[in-house]
Amino acid sequence: MSEFLNTHNASILLSAVNKSHYPQDDLPEIALAGRSNVGKSSFINTLLGRKNLARTSSKPGKTQSLNFYNIDDKLRFVDVPGYGYAKVSKKERAKWGKMIEEYLTSRENLRAVVSLVDFRHDPSSDDVQMYDFLKYYEIPVILVATKADKVPRGKWNKQESAIKKKLDFDSNDAFIIFSSVDRTGLDTSWDAILESL
């Protein structure tokens, strides 16, 4: 990984709410999607070896735009607003939905979506909907189950099976068990991302 990419050379590039704001070049992009508070910011920070590049928040639903991160001028991460947060108005949610859909279905730079689910729980209906959406549009998916440090190792197989069953998981997709606390799944995540470029 390090031969190709200096992952520490990363910065937030811009925030976009529609197509006209997207970067106008052909760098490959990996989008990151998941429920509010699934640990998306922690995932980004862990992958990039940074503490606060992606701001973590105790207030879910904080990211309201597409945040583009430049990684070593070779790749971009695109942080998609967290879904499934009840305290946001229906109108606001519909607006986010449209923005996310527009990006995911029409962005030529997009190579894959890292879809994050909470390893402690079965996927929510929003998680299932997101996975179905990505499969419908034939967008490559890397499924990352976060917060693995909070699940006893003896229950990992059972929990992985439950998540896969609920999602009707495609065995061709990568399934990665991840923890930003002990960095479980860090190298596997990078391998899957670089493979999709």
Swiss-Prot record:
Keyword terms, alphabetized: Cell cycle, Cell division, GTP-binding, Magnesium, Metal-binding, Nucleotide-binding, Septation
Keyword check for Cell division: yes
GO BP term (any one): division septum assembly
CDD domains for the chain: YihA_EngB
GO molecular function ontology, one term from the record: GTP binding
GO-annotated cellular components: cytosol
Record: residues binding Mg(2+): S41, T63
The protein's role, per its UniProt record: Necessary for normal cell division and for the maintenance of normal septation.
Residues that coordinate or bind GTP: 34-41, 61-65, 79-82, 146-149, 178-180
Coiled-coil stretches noted in the UniProt entry, renumbered to this chain: none
InterPro entries referenced in this protein's UniProt entry, alphabetically: G_ENGB_dom (IPR030393), GTP-bd (IPR006073), GTP-bd_ribosome_bio_YsxC (IPR019987), P-loop_NTPase (IPR027417), Small_GTP-bd (IPR005225)
Protein name as it appears in the record: Probable GTP-binding protein EngB
One of the Pfam families matching this protein, by short name: MMR_HSR1
Domain EngB-type G: 26-197
Family of this protein: Belongs to the TRAFAC class TrmE-Era-EngA-EngB-Septin-like GTPase superfamily. EngB GTPase family.
Species annotation: Streptococcus mutans serotype c (strain ATCC 700610 / UA159)
Highest taxon in the source lineage: Bacteria
The encoding gene: engB
PROSITE patterns, A to Z: G_ENGB
Cofactor: Mg(2+)
NCBIfam families for this protein: GTPase_YsxC, small_GTP
